[in-house]
């Protein structure tokens, strides 16, 4: 879990056998473990784990392998058509950041859907590569899109939950849900604290609301609302809760924290080992949403 006992000493190196342990990747354990050195166990770690769900570390080498490079004859028509939905009177910058990130991440065509009332302001501030449309005619807005990312700056007014539901009902392609789109969903599941405390994995999480297959990108506060559980509990059972959520809802969960992790529907969890404190600034999550949409 990464939790440490009172009085735990800090080390320069920790030798671990077979494979790196989760507690050395999660704070505060990572802060006292120093540099982790993996020593041979005498058998492949896959055999030791058997059929259990696995946790994988993301480093620069793995990230490079996963990047989908453009073919030499590529043009905008084959590089994807992305739609970003967001924005409100008080939050104009968030959807702009997301849309521009999608452009810089390789999407061939990017359209930003915002409320009609802020459309002129957005058009005057965004880079010219991004087309801007109104969310009022959202069915036409969705036509031809190969990925839709929704949430940055969307707002939390009373009409937003119905708007989010209408998009989810109307669009059948790849989805990225972030920020206020996640807030609009409310509590989608519940956690049995006793089962979590006792390690009864099969009984930990119960689904209250079905979700479409999508990528969800909550920070700890947003995840706390989704599963109706205090943040302090999430911090103690970080990987377990992310894994069970992704498996139960059959979604891809990008849980933003220290470290950020990616949980897949099959139970595999990827832990990011290369994040840094420089990411702790406003708008970083909006950019991530756009990057994910661009990669899709």
Predicted features by range, described:
Residues 7-9:
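A conserved, positively charged/aromatic
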Residues 11-14, 19-179, 183-215, 220-296:
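Small-residue (G/A/S/T)-rich helix-start motifs and N-terminal tracts that mark the onset
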Residues 1-3:
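Proline/glycine-rich low-complexity loops and linkers
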């Amino acid at each position: 879990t990464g939790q440490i006992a009172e009085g735990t000493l800090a080390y320069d190196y920790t030798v671990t056998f077979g494979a790196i342990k989760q507690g050395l990747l999660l704070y505060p354990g990572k802060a006292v473990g120093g540099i982790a050195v993996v020593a041979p166990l005498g058998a492949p770690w896959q055999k030791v784990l058997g059929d259990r769900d696995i946790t994988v570390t993301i480093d620069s080498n793995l990230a490079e392998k996963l990047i989908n490079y453009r073919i030499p004859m590529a043009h905008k028509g084959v590089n994807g058509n992305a739609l970003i939905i967001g924005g409100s009177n008080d939050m104009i910058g968030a959807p702009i950041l997301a849309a521009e990130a999608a452009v810089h991440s390789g999407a061939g065509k990017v359209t930003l859907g915002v409320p009609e009332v802020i459309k002129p302001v957005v058009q005057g501030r965004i880079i010219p590569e991004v087309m801007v449309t109104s969310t009022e005619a959202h069915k036409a807005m969705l036509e031809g899109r190969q990925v839709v990312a929704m949430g940055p700056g969307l707002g939390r007014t009373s009409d937003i939950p119905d708007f989010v539901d209408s998009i989810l009902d109307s669009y059948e392609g790849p989805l990225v849900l972030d920020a206020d789109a996640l807030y609009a969903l409310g509590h989608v599941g519940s956690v049995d604290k006793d089962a979590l405390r006792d390690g009864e994995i099969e009984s930990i999480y119960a689904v209250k609301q079905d979700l479409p297959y999508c990528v969800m990108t909550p920070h700890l506060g947003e995840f706390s609302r989704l599963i109706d559980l205090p943040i302090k509990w999430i911090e103690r059972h970080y990987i377990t809760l992310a894994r069970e959520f992704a498996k139960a809802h059959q979604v891809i969960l990008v849980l933003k924290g220290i470290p950020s992790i990616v949980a897949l529907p099959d139970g595999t969890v990827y832990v990011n080992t290369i994040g840094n404190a420089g990411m702790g600034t406003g708008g970083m999550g909006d950019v991530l949403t756009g990057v994910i949409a661009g990669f899709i």
